[in-house]
């Protein structure tokens, strides 16, 4: 199951999900990519009727959620709780503003997470442009090991601004959780680091 949290009231770029790229809304492009991954049903979780209508108009599925959520994770959990009982092991949380997400990366994330029986995983990529380190609009992840296809490091920290260090990567905003872990995760108190890096 791929759940896509999406809302119009983003602080950095309001109405972003409905902006068009080559005549198609960003949210519709994200839904199309998610469907092409063939990793399961794709549902957009949104508080906005405009997004709901846009998704449905383009053949997608969406569910209205509360407008009180502090995070996309809270939003997808509400969406999950509204779905009828299903046999789901993992939930992929794909951000609604990632129209260029690589389908193969989504597949690798699922395969590696399942193979390693991990409770939760996320995607990151190498940083090739040094300006990204100082760009507060791009979240960076610091890992315990150098990232490569042969290891599965864990995230030590997530930061918006960072000037130096090693094992720093561009966080791609895609998560996968075991359903039981998602249920535990949303009940945790937000850390100071999470609140300061929003």
Segment roles from a protein language model:
Residues 1-46:
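N-terminal glycine-rich phosphate-binding loop and ensuing alpha1 helix
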Residues 39, 85-88, 115-119:
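Short, high-confidence coil segments that cap the C-terminus of an alpha-helix
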Residues 43, 49-111:
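Short phosphate-binding loop-to-helix
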Residues 46-47, 101, 177, 196:
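A conserved hydrophobic position in a structured secondary element of the catalytic/binding core
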Residues 101-190:
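Conserved core of the sugar-phosphate nucleotidyltransferase
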């Amino acid at each position: 199951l791929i759940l896509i949290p999406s809302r119009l009231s983003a602080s950095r770029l309001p109405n972003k999900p409905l902006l068009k790229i080559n005549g198609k809304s960003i949210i519709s492009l994200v839904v199309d990519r998610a469907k092409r991954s063939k990793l399961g049903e794709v549902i957009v979780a949104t508080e906005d009727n405009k997004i709901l209508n846009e998704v449905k108009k383009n053949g997608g599925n969406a569910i209205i959620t509360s407008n009180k959520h502090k995070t996309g994770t809270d939003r997808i959990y509400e969406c999950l709780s509204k779905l009828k009982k299903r046999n789901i092991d993992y939930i992929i949380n794909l951000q609604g503003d990632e129209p260029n997400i690589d389908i193969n990366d989504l597949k690798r994330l699922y395969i590696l997470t399942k193979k390693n029986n991990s409770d939760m995983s996320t995607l990151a990529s190498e940083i090739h442009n040094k300006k990204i380190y100082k760009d507060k609009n791009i979240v960076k992840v610091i890992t315990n090991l150098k990232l490569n296809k042969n290891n599965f490091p864990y995230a030590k920290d997530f930061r918006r601004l960072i000037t130096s260090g090693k094992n720093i990567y561009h966080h791609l905003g895609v998560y996968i959780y075991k359903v039981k872990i998602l249920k535990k995760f949303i009940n945790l108190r937000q850390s100071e680091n999470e609140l300061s890096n929003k």
